[in-house]
Amino acid sequence: MNELEFVTLHRRHLHQYPELSLHEFETTSYITSFLEDLGVPYDRPLKTGVIAYLEGNSHHTIAFRADIDALPIYEENDIDFKSKNDHVMHACGHDGHTTALMLFVKRCKALYDKSELPHNVVFIFQPAEETGGGANRLIKAGAFDKYPIEAVFGFHVNPFEKEGKIVIRDEEITASATEYRFFLKGLSSHVADKEQGHSCGEGLQHVLSQIGQIQQFHLNGLKRNIIHMGHFEAGEAINTVPSHGYLEGTIRTYDTEDLAIVKHQMHKIAESVQLLFNVECEVKFEEGYPPTMNHPQLRQAVENAIEGANLEVVEKKLPFLFGEDFSFYGQQLAPSYFVFVGTQNKEKGFVTGLHTAHLNFDEKILIDVVNYYEHLLRNYKEV
């Protein structure tokens, strides 16, 4: 089996059997069976996910990560390897990430068998990137305590960049992701006696209006921030004053000071609802993923590896606005660098974005990724 056949076989199997965050049991079994067949040792510090390891010829230890979970999306692709798990799909390309790392393990094992593996390598098949913060869970579980990891590398497919190109950026490359929720509690009454009630409808309308003002009047207009309102509801019946209200959304930013400003203003909005409408209002935050920070001292190694793999470097001027839990590795484990690998091919129809029901790509790009990884490994120098 050549490498194109390898990545096609494994990626399409994984694509047919996607599993949601923290439920990647069959995916984990598939990976461990592959590792056992190769004779590569591994650990399972969590119920799902796998950490594999090969000892090389130096004291340096480098980690490479792939996320393995899928999304609750019904696939609409008309392909013979369409998802067989109802309303679950690899709509973010993690089937490709996993397959690329499997091929890289295979290459590294071949080098190891010939005593030619240049450095120690940790292979992270990580669960729960989409929800659950699998990277942070692994770190807190002590999954890496026995490995003196010096650098962590990872990638994500990018359907907005053409095949053969890899997008890089020093410092922030993805945003932080913080969820917020407003809870309103008023007093119901019949609409004929609405003055007797305390309406969460008006209170919620005020919240919606004021959230929209935060970005315009309290944040630097030259920075890219998102305050998104994703879902809201109020009321119980057509002829009653709403006694309850709810709103939830997400905040995306690269700057911790901006995030603090947004939170402060949201607390003030909640207080104003109580004063203006006599409605109890509370806002709660759920911290998501911090910004993914690329270590500048790894940049030259990354650029050299991309060029060594005959791929094109594309410099990203502004960070992406989505969150990515790869950020925890750079924050808590070791210097890290995360890149975005182009998968767009208009002739083949590979143009739809991430988290869509039609995401697809040519498996050959996964071999490009492994070539890039191998150049990183062979030419790694201590940061």
Curated annotation (Swiss-Prot):
Might you give the EC number(s) for this enzyme?
A: 3.-.-.-
| Transcription among keywords | no
Main EC class the enzyme belongs to: hydrolase
Q: Which GO terms describe its molecular function?
A: hydrolase activity
Q: Which Gene3D superfamilies match?
A: 3.30.70.360, Zn peptidases (3.40.630.10)
By its UniProt entry, which InterPro entries does this protein fall under? Amidohydrolase, Bact_exopeptidase_dim_dom, Peptidase_M20, Peptidase_M20_dimer
What are the record keywords, sorted?
A: Hydrolase
Task: Family membership, please give it.
Answer: Belongs to the peptidase M20 family.
Protein name from the UniProt record: Uncharacterized hydrolase SERP0968
Name the species this protein comes from: Staphylococcus epidermidis (strain ATCC 35984 / DSM 28319 / BCRC 17069 / CCUG 31568 / BM 3577 / RP62A)
